[in-house]
């Protein structure tokens, strides 16, 4: 999928944001992939360590993913500037580290010619599976409409839960939305972890909500012009951009970018 075409006004807003932030358009697109890998990493953490892992930065990062998942739509996201959706670079720190780790690991040849990191196997597997599922989901108009409709419903319900996107009822709704869309497709994404967590309903809901946020990040990445082959042929450029983004993260005040209300 080539970069989706948007209105001149929307593109101008992106150009202005990029100029003011010092981030390039390629780096802006990469942040969507970072969000996908963050969702994959948090899915792994939830499945192996339970909801207790959602403290401090992990909780903040999870929150940012969930909020953004409600603002990424079939035709056009609320913003083409990634940090307008995800808040700030600190909110994506887990994804920055996860994607960089996957890219620098030794690679093995596979039939698909895609890299297979040894150490980051599960996180990488989840990310690749979500990329595949996203394309299938958004090829089905009924699924795309289901997501759009439920996003609006959840946004309304958040008013009754003090805009707490991690409220159990909201997580359950996002989990159901994932099941009703990506969960209906094959091959299904199987999550591996400890039985005590994978049999716990609140943890299951959090995992599925996290997977939905990853599905949405994958869609956002494609909207911005991302594709799987960039992971193979653009690896060096990605690493350079990730390290530049890390420098920007340390230089910028954490509160400089805030999600739109």
Residue spans for each PLM region:
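Leu/Val/Ala/Ile-rich N-terminal alpha-helices, chiefly Sec-type signal peptides and the beginnings
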Residues: 2-98
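Short, solvent-exposed segments of well-ordered alpha helices
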Residues: 20-34, 56, 83, 113-124, ...
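Charged, amphipathic alpha-helical oligomerization/scaffolding segments
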Residues: 31, 35-42, 125, 129, ...
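Structured alpha-helical bundle/scaffold domains in large eukaryotic membrane-trafficking regulators
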Residues: 48-55, 193, 226-233
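Short, mixed-charge aromatic SLiMs
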Residues: 61-72, 153-161, 233-250
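Long amphipathic alpha-helical segments with strong coiled-coil/leucine-zipper propensity
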Residues: 66-165
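Conserved binding-pocket/active-site segment within a compact domain
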Residues: 152-226
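Alpha-helical oligomerization segments
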Residues: 203-261
